[in-house]
């Protein structure tokens, strides 16, 4: 693990998968959750043949999109990701916030367009994806036994 402005942990060598710690604060995450929750809609995927967005049984989640110009904190997150990855964020997509909830899932898939998906990102004007950045946020549950009758659950971040 490297120590710097952000902690870097190499999780896998090939393909290279890196975990960066402390890029988003708890305050950043709370702001993202507050802004995205009222916007959540059933997630869609792009049909590679038609280019249309549609729901799919292999992706069960709710999704919202946040623009960097909506809040200086979102803009700062983009800046930090650019700093860590050394990638230009000008052609990146909006910040996608997904909630998989109970029973939600996304089956294995590609985040880049394959050869047969010639116009996958045409409407965005961004070109193909070269990297995917994920902030993984989950609630942890602590169960405390109460009089041998059941369990008590506390939400802890």
What name fits each language-model region?
Residues 1-157:
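Fe(II)/2-oxoglutarate oxygenase catalytic core
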């Amino acid at each position: 693990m490297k120590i710097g402005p952000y902690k870097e942990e190499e999780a896998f060598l090939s393909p290279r998968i890196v975990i960066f710690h402390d890029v988003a604060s708890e305050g950043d995450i709370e702001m993202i959750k507050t802004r995205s929750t009222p916007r959540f809609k059933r997630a869609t995927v792009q049909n590679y043949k038609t280019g249309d967005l549609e729901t799919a049984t292999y992706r069960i989640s709710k999704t919202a999109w946040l623009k960097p110009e909506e809040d200086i904190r979102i803009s700062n997150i983009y800046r930090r990701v650019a700093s860590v990855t050394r990638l230009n964020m000008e052609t990146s997509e909006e910040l996608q916030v997904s909630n998989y909830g109970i029973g939600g899932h996304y089956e294995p898939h590609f985040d880049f367009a394959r050869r047969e998906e010639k116009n996958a990102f045409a409407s965005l004007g961004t070109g193909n994806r070269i990297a995917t950045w994920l902030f993984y946020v989950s609630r942890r549950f602590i169960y405390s036994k109460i009089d041998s009758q059941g369990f008590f659950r506390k939400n802890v971040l």
